Amino acid sequence: MKTFINKKVSLNKRITFRRRRRKPVQPGERIDYKNLRLLCRFVSKQAKILSRRVSRLTSKQQRTVARYIKSARVLAFMPFVNNET
């Protein structure tokens, strides 16, 4: 008695590779209220502070970024609202 083993390889099976995401704040980058290029990455078009889930920051980084965004707004480095739309 012979046993047949189906050795067909599924053509629909694909190997997927995940690309590593860059960290939102690089290790050498300094979070500061004067670093507007960094702070603007964590603000939406409506000038709202993005959530941790969207910005992929740690909770400590999120608190720091939020504090410095608020300081930059008070010192008039950043707008409170965006009236472009």
Curated annotation (Swiss-Prot):
GO terms for cellular component: chloroplast; mitochondrial small ribosomal subunit. Keywords: Chloroplast, Plastid, Ribonucleoprotein, Ribosomal protein, RNA-binding, rRNA-binding. GO terms for biological process: translation. The keyword Hydrolase does not apply. Its main location: plastid. It is found in: Plastid, Chloroplast. It comes from the Eukaryota. GO terms for molecular function: small ribosomal subunit rRNA binding; structural constituent of ribosome. Part of the 30S ribosomal subunit. HAMAP family: Ribosomal_bS18. Belongs to the bacterial ribosomal protein bS18 family. PANTHER family: 30S RIBOSOMAL PROTEIN S18, SMALL RIBOSOMAL SUBUNIT PROTEIN BS18M. This is Small ribosomal subunit protein bS18c.
